[in-house]
């Protein structure tokens, strides 16, 4: 699998790089960002995958979150893929900001015309890790995942659908119960069709109820002044209730005065990287 380097910038002793490759799953060219800490020059490091939110590319997280300082300190390789296939020339892919381009929702679409390209779930859990493991100094046994909003949803479902694959999971303002919120209903109806029983396979709150894997410790930060919390897009209470019932440990922190933006993410990113480092470096 050929990788084309798009950029490389020294940052906190390591290198922040962006690559492009031709994706088999998505049948298009895809970019991903990867931060290689200084420790990666001499040893295989754990890998931490970040999934971004609606409208984002691979750039938002690496330029706005300030993740590199903590990643350098803890010796973590941080990988940030794009949020959807790009340039597939599907009718309607650019019609709205919350569906199609920049809004893959980390599902494998089953509905025509999306099912050929929109396979972000398999891309993130299978194709991309294989590519990373083959080309970079990462330890394939030590991986974790986190994300924001739509990507927080993605991180939670990837961890819950693959017991034991990820050492830890965390999220900022995740879409916790997409089968019940407007964003989720729109995306799932488009990608997965009208049969709502299929939607549950990609809903963290539904997945928790049937989870039977090894214990997984979940960290969630949520801004109290997040407009998408107040208008019912995120529904964290439903997820927490399901976790409590299943005795799955969740640290849920409602952060006074914070919104849905990268200013919020940047404030708490070090806490999240520390959370993952605790499990990845154990």
Curated annotation (Swiss-Prot):
Catalytic reaction equation(s): S-formylglutathione + H2O = formate + glutathione + H(+)
List of residues that carry N6-succinyllysine: 4
NCBIfam families hit by this protein: fghA_ester_D
Single Gene Ontology MF annotation: identical protein binding
Similarity section: Belongs to the esterase D family.
Pfam families: Esterase
Keyword line: Acetylation, Cytoplasm, Cytoplasmic vesicle, Hydrolase, Serine esterase
Biological processes per GO annotation: formaldehyde catabolic process
Designated name of the protein: S-formylglutathione hydrolase
GO CC, one annotated term: cytoplasmic vesicle
Role summary: Serine hydrolase involved in the detoxification of formaldehyde.
Disulfide bonds: none
Active site: 149 (charge relay system), 226 (charge relay system), 260 (charge relay system)
Modified residue annotations for N6-acetyllysine: 200
Subunit structure and binding partners: Homodimer.
Cited InterPro entries: AB_hydrolase_fold, Esterase-like, S-formylglutathione_hydrol
Compartment(s): Cytoplasm; Cytoplasmic vesicle
Keyword Acetylation: yes
EC number: 3.1.2.12
């Amino acid at each position: 699998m050929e990788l084309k380097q798009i950029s490389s910038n020294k940052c906190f002793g390591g290198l922040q790089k962006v690559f492009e490759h031709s994706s088999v799953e998505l049948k298009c060219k895809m970019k991903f960002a990867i931060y290689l800490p200084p420790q990666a020059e001499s040893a295989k490091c754990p890998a931490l995958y970040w999934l971004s939110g609606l409208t984002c590319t691979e750039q938002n997280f690496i330029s706005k979150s300030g993740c590199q300082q903590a990643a350098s300190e803890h010796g973590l390789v941080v990988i940030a893929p794009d949020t959807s296939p790009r340039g597939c020339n599907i009718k309607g892919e650019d019609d709205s900001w919350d569906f199609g381009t920049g809004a893959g929702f980390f599902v494998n679409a089953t509905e025509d015309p999306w099912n050929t390209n929109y396979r972000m779930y398999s891309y993130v859990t299978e194709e991309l890790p294989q590519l990373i493991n083959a080309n970079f100094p990462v330890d394939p046994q030590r991986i974790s995942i986190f994300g924001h909003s739509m990507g927080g949803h993605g991180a939670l479902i990837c961890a819950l659908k693959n017991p034991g694959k990820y050492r830890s999971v965390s999220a900022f303002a995740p879409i916790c119960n997409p089968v019940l919120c407007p964003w989720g209903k729109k995306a799932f109806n488009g990608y997965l069709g009208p049969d709502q029983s299929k939607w549950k396979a990609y809903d963290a709150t539904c997945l928790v109820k049937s989870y039977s894997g090894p214990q997984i410790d979940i960290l969630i930060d949520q801004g109290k002044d997040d407009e998408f919390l107040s208008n019912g897009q995120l529904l964290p209470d439903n997820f927490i209730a399901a976790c409590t019932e299943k005795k799955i440990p969740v640290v849920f922190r409602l952060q006074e005065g914070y919104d849905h933006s990268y200013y919020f993410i940047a404030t708490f990113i070090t806490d999240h990287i520390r959370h993952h480092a605790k499990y990845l470096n154990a």
